[in-house]
Amino acid sequence: HNRSKLSPDKDNGATYHDTLKSLMSVSDVLSVCCPASNETINLINKETLEYLPKGAVVTNVARGDIVDDEALIDALERRKVYAVGLDVYKGEPNLNPGYLKYKQAFILPHLGSATKETRTAMANLAIDNIEEYFKTGNCKNKVN
C-alpha cells in the first residue's frame, strides 16, 4: 500500500485503494508494516478485521500496539481469520495467552530485524556513538 496513488509509469499494475476498508476487503493476506502513531494505535481492531475476507491471514511485523489482540483472537476463534503471524505484540515480551490455544497462531520473539545487515548496522551505530562520545562528550542516539 502506498499513501498516494502512483503515476501509471510507476505503479507496476498495482491497484490503488483510497480507504483501508477497500484495501482490506480484497486482501487474503494482511501484513501490518506501518509505524506506531496516534493514528495507528489499534488500527487493526474488531471493526477493521470484519473488512477482511473470511479465512484471511494477518501478520504483524510493525508494532504491537497497532493490533487489538482481543479482536484478533476473537477473529481466530470465529474463523474469520485463518491464521496469524506475529513478530511483535502488545506488552512484549508478555504474550496474550489467548493466542496459545491456536495451532494457526505463529508467534516469533521479535526477530524481524535479525538479519546480518541490520545487526551489522546496529553494531556500527553503537561504535559510532561510542567514538563520538569520547571525542565530543555527546552522541547522536543518546538515551537518558
Please provide the spans of the model-predicted regions.
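Rossmann-like dinucleotide-binding domain for NAD(H)/NADP(H)
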Residues: G55-N144
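Rossmann-like dinucleotide/phosphate-binding beta-alpha-beta segment
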Residues: H1-K54
